[in-house]
């Protein structure tokens, strides 16, 4: 199976496509197929004006359409699209989510800072960490910082 993740941050949007490689029921991994980054600065609009401007929305829709084509070409089975700090703060975020769904069929979730930290933490294999130590995971983004202990 192939999976895609779309990350809408304050300074860029990213598409990651990975394929699950299954050796056995307990032995599998994900192989990166593609990673695309578009330097679209939603935070520049939101943190100054409180909303995402029309020009930036237009570029966001075009980027999502391009991402949709890349997912189709790569036969992606499942996609999750998440937006973080800038979209949490944008007064027109609900409008943007509806527009993206109508234009591309992609459902954009605006996730909380807590969910963002949980997703980052879930990428680490705890079994590979030394249990004699404590760890802190820090994500410094363009509009927020998340900590996981």
Identify the residue ranges that each predicted region occupies.
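Nucleotide/phosphate-binding catalytic cleft detector across ATP-hydrolyzing
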Residues: 1-10, 16-137, 148-149
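Acidic, divalent-metal-coordinating active-site segment for phosphoryl/phosphodiester hydrolysis
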Residues: 142-146
